[in-house]
Amino acid sequence: MLAENIQFQTISWEGYDHEDRYRVYAFGRTEDGRSTCVHFPYRPFFYVGLKKDGPNVSHLSILRELFKLFDRKVEKYFPCDRHNNEHCGFCDKFARTPLWGDYYMPGVERFVPHSSVNLWGFNNENKIPTVKLVFKNSKSMRSFRSKIRFHQDYEKNFQLFESNLDPILRVMHVSKCSSTGWIKVPYFLTTEKHTNCDIEIELQNYKDLTPLDRQDIAPFRTGSFDIECFSETGAFPKSTNKEDLVFQIGLTRQDYGRPELMKVGLSVAPCQESQ
């Protein structure tokens, strides 16, 4: 249910493949200190082009060369009354040249024609044709990228663009959100929580993220600890040695912008009170 918009400052971004889909998680706190998580699906992608240039290079020719790289055939036929076949594979006159929508490859959700300026070398700002490969998840993207890069014909014929860019950085770029900035999102409470945050919101996509021009800092909670150990042998203590003990732990916790500081000392035996 939509109640209102909520503003919070992000402190951590994470991305995972969940149920065969890539999802982005943004964690942070509101100005009143409530922990917040926003998550949404995202489709990672990269671009592929040909190293050769000229008028014969088009989006469709790139796609054809890509399919040749993997020895995949795309054959489309019109219905044939002669052979009573819905897709006749016997009569050449019924065959047609594959169209853009006929190309399909497992793991790739869709192929998108794209034109952009190649920053390598001098191109006089002329755009070159490329094909944008959109994937369902990061596993499929990494697998397909490796298949192209480690193919024997890759260095000779193909170029990959932005294939090593982390999808999290891509989300920040396209949404114009900074890694530790303030953002505003619609207050859609999720029906099934995946975290222990006070507020968890599930969005449709990254377009629901609105960056805010705020310089204040949310009351993030900082925790620190220090341990004192005993070593049976005098060497560095080992957790696998039962005689090497942690005999004292010191803890502090503070919320940013607030003077209260929590101090806790834990000891395996009574100790003298600190001054």
Where are these regions (language model features)?
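The two-metal-ion catalytic cores of nucleic-acid processing enzymes
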Residues: 1-275
